[in-house]
């Protein structure tokens, strides 16, 4: 009995060293409750009114000083997946982009730089590992490469690169993501 008690007594003080031995990009989640934002259901309803379909993923990110819900919605009309962004303070849709494949003729005819060049531009500014990449066509006809980068300093950032100029259009810190990309 004493032997077991002695082993437990020695183990308890060192257990915390192993329990928190990982990087987390969710450290800022407690800050979200300080935002004055609409319910996610309100923005989801707005997104469904814009693109009828099925939500596959939800991301919460900060664009400038605005909190944004971004939904990936698989359209019941054409089967494409759309990224629908909703301003979480105001509750209205601010952007819609259609995800397209690598062989999309419209995207390929308009894009002037390769996805590899766009990726190197993004990583040069935000060093880390690209964990996902997409080709998107905006409702205004704009062509964008989108990269999710797990940065070397521990947070995830979403970087949009203009497929015509190669310039970074925006880079936004992603606070959380629920769901998965369609395979």
Say what each PLM segment does.
Residues 2-8, 16-183:
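Long, terminal "pre-/pro-" and other extracytoplasmic accessory regions
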């Amino acid at each position: 009995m004493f032997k077991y008690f002695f082993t437990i007594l020695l183990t308890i003080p060192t257990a915390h060293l192993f329990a928190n031995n990982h990087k987390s990009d969710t450290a800022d989640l407690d800050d979200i409750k300080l935002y004055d934002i609409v319910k996610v259901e309100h923005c989801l309803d707005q997104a469904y009114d814009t693109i009828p379909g099925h939500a596959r993923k939800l991301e919460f990110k900060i664009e400038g000083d605005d909190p944004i819900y971004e939904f990936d919605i698989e359209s019941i009309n054409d089967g494409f997946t759309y990224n629908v962004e909703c301003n979480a303070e105001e509750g209205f849709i601010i952007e819609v982009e259609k995800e397209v494949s690598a062989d999309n003729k419209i995207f390929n005819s308009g894009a002037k730089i390769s996805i590899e060049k766009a990726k190197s531009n993004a990583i040069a500014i935000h060093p880390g590992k690209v964990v996902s990449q997409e080709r998107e066509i905006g409702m205004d006809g704009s062509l964008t490469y989108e990269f999710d980068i797990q940065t070397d300093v521990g947070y995830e950032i979403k970087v949009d690169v203009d497929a015509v100029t190669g310039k970074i259009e925006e880079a936004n810190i992603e606070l959380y993501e629920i769901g998965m990309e369609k395979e």
